[in-house]
């Protein structure tokens, strides 16, 4: 990588409640702690991250659109939009930026409606059920992929 790679980290609805909401599923860390750890990790890896959490689908879509020709990789936890948003899928396909889908909980061990993802078949990879560590693993995988290309 000749210039510093830029990675966009997107978090969907209700993830602003991490640490409060259903800690048995989502863990006790809040989103600020997760993003701070990712920022430290990114600095050590020599990459730059940008972060956005939104409960509004259109804001996530606009962030994806604005990433075009500016961002090298996306890490996304679409949260509930995983199971409902064709629009997020289309935005990701439209900008053609590789992405990894992350989920804190194991969505396949939960309610049946959580088993389907509109994004996973287009993702470079999917990490689920590993809690906040999933973001760390996703960042390592993204950097490794960027450095090998």
Curated annotation (Swiss-Prot):
<dbReference type="InterPro" id="IPR018509">
    <property type="entry name" value="DHquinase_II_CS"/>
</dbReference>
<dbReference type="GO" id="GO:0019631">
    <property type="term" value="P:quinate catabolic process"/>
</dbReference>
<feature type="binding site">
    <location>
        <position position="90"/>
    </location>
    <ligand>
        <name>substrate</name>
    </ligand>
</feature>
<dbReference type="GO" id="GO:0008652">
    <property type="term" value="P:amino acid biosynthetic process"/>
</dbReference>
<keyword id="KW-0057">Aromatic amino acid biosynthesis</keyword>
<dbReference type="InterPro" id="IPR001874">
    <property type="entry name" value="DHquinase_II"/>
</dbReference>
<feature type="active site" description="Proton acceptor">
    <location>
        <position position="26"/>
    </location>
</feature>
<keyword id="KW-0028">Amino-acid biosynthesis</keyword>
<protein>
    <recommendedName>
        <fullName>3-dehydroquinate dehydratase</fullName>
        <ecNumber>4.2.1.10</ecNumber>
    </recommendedName>
</protein>
<feature type="site" description="Transition state stabilizer">
    <location>
        <position position="21"/>
    </location>
</feature>
<feature type="binding site">
    <location>
        <position position="114"/>
    </location>
    <ligand>
        <name>substrate</name>
    </ligand>
</feature>
<comment type="function">
    <text>Catalyzes a trans-dehydration via an enolate intermediate.</text>
</comment>
<feature type="binding site">
    <location>
        <begin position="104"/>
        <end position="105"/>
    </location>
    <ligand>
        <name>substrate</name>
    </ligand>
</feature>
<dbReference type="GO" id="GO:0009073">
    <property type="term" value="P:aromatic amino acid family biosynthetic process"/>
</dbReference>
<feature type="active site" description="Proton donor">
    <location>
        <position position="103"/>
    </location>
</feature>
<dbReference type="GO" id="GO:0003855">
    <property type="term" value="F:3-dehydroquinate dehydratase activity"/>
</dbReference>
<comment type="subunit">
    <text>Homododecamer.</text>
</comment>
<dbReference type="GO" id="GO:0009423">
    <property type="term" value="P:chorismate biosynthetic process"/>
</dbReference>
<feature type="binding site">
    <location>
        <position position="83"/>
    </location>
    <ligand>
        <name>substrate</name>
    </ligand>
</feature>
<feature type="binding site">
    <location>
        <position position="77"/>
    </location>
    <ligand>
        <name>substrate</name>
    </ligand>
</feature>
<comment type="pathway">
    <text>Metabolic intermediate biosynthesis; chorismate biosynthesis; chorismate from D-erythrose 4-phosphate and phosphoenolpyruvate: step 3/7.</text>
</comment>
<comment type="similarity">
    <text>Belongs to the type-II 3-dehydroquinase family.</text>
</comment>
<dbReference type="Pfam" id="PF01220">
    <property type="entry name" value="DHquinase_II"/>
</dbReference>
<keyword id="KW-0456">Lyase</keyword>
<dbReference type="InterPro" id="IPR036441">
    <property type="entry name" value="DHquinase_II_sf"/>
</dbReference>
């Amino acid at each position: 990588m000749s210039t510093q790679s830029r990675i966009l980290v997107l978090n969907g609805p209700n993830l602003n409640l991490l640490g409060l909401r259903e800690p048995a599923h989502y863990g006790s860390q809040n989103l600020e702690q997760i993003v701070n750890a990712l920022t430290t990790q990114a600095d050590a890896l020599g990459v730059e991250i940008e972060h956005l959490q939104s409960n509004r689908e259109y804001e996530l879509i606009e962030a994806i659109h604005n990433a075009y020709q500016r961002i090298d990789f996306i890490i996304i936890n679409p949260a509930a939009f995983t199971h409902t948003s064709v629009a997020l899928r289309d935005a990701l396909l439209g900008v053609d930026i590789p992405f990894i889908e992350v989920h804190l909980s194991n969505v396949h061990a939960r309610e049946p409606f959580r088993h389907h993802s509109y994004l996973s078949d287009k993702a470079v990879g999917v990490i689920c059920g590993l809690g906040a560590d999933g973001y760390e693993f996703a960042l390592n995988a993204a950097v490794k992929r960027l450095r090998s290309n």
